[in-house]
Regions:
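Conserved RNase H-like, two-metal-ion catalytic cores of nucleic-acid enzymes
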Residues: 109-181
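N-terminal accessory regions of nucleic-acid-interacting proteins
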Residues: 1-118
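Residue at a conserved register position within TPR or TPR-like alpha-solenoid repeats
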Residues: 314, 349-350, 385-386, 431
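Acidic, Mg2+-coordinating catalytic module of metal-dependent nucleases/exonucleases
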Residues: 222, 228-301, 308
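Structural register within alpha-helical repeat arrays
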Residues: 310, 345-346, 381, 395, ...
């Protein structure tokens, strides 16, 4: 099926364009905010393709696409390089932090087996012929970002037709091998599996990221999933980075734009596709910087949602004192919808590491709120009063309140039959204990 698709697309191309000499070519490295005089020393990309000698047609296409025709052992492709200087910001995030020390002690929140080192990181984003993946989907544009001497370097690799896929993938693999940590956004489920499968099918030895692939999407969800409508990259740019793109194209349009490009080889909207991909790389770099700053000093004032998310991650990493500080800071921002969750986490944390006596005050506070529909603090209080204090009447009172709440919410999970059965069993046990005590003491 893939071969038929390739043949069909080549036929459409040849009918619209006599030969490959009319294919889009660009030239050079672009530095944001700099003229051509400042571009004489582009960042070196290893063996990621040698530039072909420019010709008049290539120079003509420089302003239309901005790339360079590069050659590899098995053919040619288009390569474009852009540098974001360290003096620049993406949204409200200064990029100089890319080379800063905020990445030390980062393994506990990245969940990798090592700390992040800026020089080891490579950012990856792909643009593909389909959004659903599958055997017929090809990555026609691969963007890679990494830390260079002058700033964030964004290398983009574009295939103008399917016969340029192998040399393009070889160049991409050469650049990837220069780094030891891969950073993507939703790349664990889409970008990298797709690229890896295309490398294998093309005979390019793939790279294996053993516990060295950081997907920023789960990190974002842990911090802001409860506050934002979604955690797409576009939402994070607007709400977190304060970056608003102008003249951007929706990602859903990109496959059709590329198919049109294959037919005509006219640049058209392909320049916007390259810009979209470049912005995605820059956004990932800015997000990583922001994550590192947030987690580098987690006890600094944050908003309630961030404090709750950081506290959970600290708790997971067994950094209990810092987790408690984050939860208490979140609670101090009351009234706020996240305060309840922080109190719940703090109560369980206190019970586990300091004992139930210390947690009683938090449970009593949660259960005593006017209009509270929380049953879990009542159950925890009942457990403590029954098993530790032997206060059976007090435990029974808490259990009765929990039963009334469960009956009120019988149509929801909070009033499930299992919960009601457990509460009724607890009540029966407490009443039996009280009866035996009365018989014993008369």
């Amino acid at each position: 099926m893939i071969a038929n698709l390739k043949s069909k697309l080549r036929a459409m191309k040849s009918s619209a364009l006599p030969g490959k000499s009319e294919a889009v070519r660009g030239a050079g490295t672009t530095a944001r905010g700099a003229g051509a005089e400042g571009m004489s020393n582009p960042e070196q990309g290893g063996n990621s393709g040698k530039e072909c000698s420019p010709d008049p047609e290539s120079r003509l296409d420089r302003d239309r696409l901005g790339g360079t025709v590069a050659s590899g052992p098995d053919g040619v492709f288009v390569r474009k390089q852009t540098i974001y200087g360290y003096e620049e910001s993406y949204g409200r995030i200064p990029l100089y932090d890319l080379q800063n020390a905020v990445f030390t002690d980062s393994f506990w929140w990245t969940r990798l087996d090592r700390d992040l080192c800026p020089k080891d990181i490579v950012f990856l984003d792909t643009e593909t012929t389909g959004l659903a993946g599958g055997s017929g989907t090809v990555a026609f544009l691969v963007g890679l970002g990494y830390v260079g001497e002058k700033g964030l370097v964004v290398d983009q690799y574009l295939m103008r037709d399917f016969d340029e896929e192998v040399p393009m993938l070889q160049a991409v693999a050469d650049q990837l091998r220069r780094h030891s940590i891969l950073v993507t956004f939703n790349g664990k489920s889409f970008d990298w599996p797709l690229l890896e499968s295309r490398m294998i099918l093309s005979g390019v030895p793939p790279i294996h990221w053993v516990n060295a692939h950081l997907d920023l999407l789960p990190v974002a969800r842990r911090l802001w999933g409860a506050r934002l409508p979604d955690c797409t990259l576009s939402t994070l740019e607007k709400e977190i980075l304060s970056q608003h793109r102008t003249d951007d194209i929706p990602g859903s349009m990109i496959p059709d734009i590329y198919l049109d490009f294959l037919k005509s080889h006219a640049p058209g909207k392909m320049r916007q596709v390259l810009q979209h991909n470049e912005w995605d790389i820059a956004a990932m770099a800015a997000l990583l910087v922001h994550f590192a700053v947030l987690y580098h000093d987690p006890e600094t004032d944050r908003d309630a949602c961030e404090l709750l998310g950081i506290g959970k991650e600290l708790e997971r990493a067994h950094r209990i004192r810092q987790a408690e500080v984050c939860y208490r800071k979140c609670i101090g921002l009351s009234p706020h919808p996240f305060v309840l969750h922080a109190k719940k986490r703090l109560a369980y944390l206190t019970k586990r590491y300091r004992g139930p006596q210390e947690a009683m005050e938090l449970w009593a506070d949660l259960a005593g709120k006017e209009g509270s529909s929380l049953y879990f603090p009542l159950i925890e209080m009942a457990k403590f009063l029954e098993h530790q204090e032997k206060d059976f009447p007090g435990a029974l009172e808490c259990t009765e309140k929990a039963i009334r709440l469960a009956n009120r919410f019988s149509d929801s999970d909070i009033g499930s039959k299992r919960l009601q059965a457990e509460l009724l069993h607890r009540r029966q046990r407490l009443m039996e204990k009280m009866r035996r005590r009365m018989e014993q003491w008369g």
